[in-house]
Amino acid sequence: MRKITAVLMALALALSLFACGGVPVQDETPGSDIQQGTVILPKPQEDNEGGDSHNGEYPSAQDPLPQKPGDTKKPEEPDKAEDGKNPGKNEDNAQTPAEDPKQEENNNNNNGDNATTPSDTKVPSGEYRAVWISYLELGGMLTGKTAGQFRSNIGAAYDNVKNLGCNTVIVHVRPFGDALYDSDYFPSSYLITGTEGDNLPFDPLKIMVEEAHNRGLTFEAWLNPYRVRARTGKALCSDNPAQKYINSGSDAVYQTANGGIFYNPGSREAIDLIVNGVREIVRNYDVDAIHFDDYFYATTDSSIDSALYAANGGGKSLAAWRRQNVNTMVREVYAAVKAEKQSVRFGISPQGNTKANYDTLYADVATWLGNAGYVDYICPQIYYGFNNATCPYSSVLKEFNGMIKVSGIDLYVGLAAYKIGNEDTYAGTSGKYEWQQNSDLLSRMVTEARGARHYKGYCLYSYSSVIMPASGVKAQVQAELTALSKIL
């Protein structure tokens, strides 16, 4: 009966996520340059680790969504998929969110939190304009290269970003429980030499920060805190802490049915490792921000932490306890960042489906945005068109804007540039062809977001989608970028 129930829950969730737009998958056959002055770099590295850098609508690691040709975003990674609201006492003694994700929004319709009127849509001063550069794109620039070659490649990528009118780069530095920098906690990434744990021939992060700052770009270090492997992939090196935990039978990691390996949010050892790893980056490198992706719990399977829950659940439901674990990590990371350098910011990019965030990834976004001491900004992946049947852009924008209840938290909107020119398979009949039939969606989305009270900027996913688009969508990508440039 338990298996039948689990299957039914997975099917229901999958249908919900499909309706919200699917998951973006990195295009591995980029076309030629899209605009004069664009520098062409090596094509994105083939993904051998279980999906692309982002995951907007993630069901369960045990029941991955079937991937369809042309669909975007990886089902393997638990990237952005949480939030809703929890009735009753909040597990962290923080502000109690409303039960219905829409309720909090509706309760605040008169306080200006959700205002998006045309009169408010002027260009904000210092607007944040960012691009995500994932490990897939870094692989082609970095693997097997000399320090000089990598410096040239990443510099060219940054020049391309600046040509888009952007001022910020969000670059992967720990995609899989590894390090693209000199670390005392995590092994060097296979992206550097091709083998995890090799001695560093040079320090990629040092170069990435220097080249960004040389161009006046803000540099954000992008980490996936829990993910070690999203599915069966490259072997872990013997010095990888996750491998040591596996060898010892520790509950600091868990493995999923599809071969994924993740740090266990309920483990004190795992939390300390994540926090220390962030502290190390902020202390040793001149990064401007720490950026977490949407990978939190990779599965709803109760067996992955049953012993920890029995020992530490404290009478909470499993779901409430899991949300508390993630909240604890987020709060401690924020404190560690500020203790090292008050000026460094900490933000998270959850997926746009707030119910999936809350119920499946156990990411309590409402608590993060309703209380001080969790984040400096939120950048939801609002990877939906205006006509999406279940999660229309405007509604999701208002929902996240309305969640922010304390001053000092900024709202950035993550936009699905990877969908330009493609069929939005799971957007429903009303939104299925929206990204093919329009060439001004990005500009309209930014214009509308500027009317939201807490809005401060946007981020495009992904670098290769706008700089090296497939030949079949190249003209439409250029049209979208031209329309966007007119409102900057």
Residue ranges and their predicted role:
Residues 16-19:
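C-terminal motif of bacterial Sec signal peptides marking the signal peptidase cleavage site
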Residues 28-122:
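Ser/Thr/Gly/Pro-rich low-complexity, disordered linker/stalk segments of secreted
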Residues 122-151, 220-221, 226-284, 429-434:
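Active-site-adjacent "subsite" loops/lids of carbohydrate-active enzymes
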Residues 145-164, 191-215, 276, 324-329:
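Aromatic- and glycine-enriched glycan-recognition loops and surfaces
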Residues 150, 167, 206, 242, ...:
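Polysaccharide-binding and catalytic clefts of secreted carbohydrate-active enzymes
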Residues 152-179, 284-289, 373-377, 455-456:
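Catalytic domains of carbohydrate-active enzymes, especially glycoside hydrolases
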Residues 164-200:
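Aromatic-lined carbohydrate-binding/catalytic grooves of carbohydrate-active enzymes
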Residues 372-392, 399-488:
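Substrate-binding cleft of secreted/luminal carbohydrate-active enzymes
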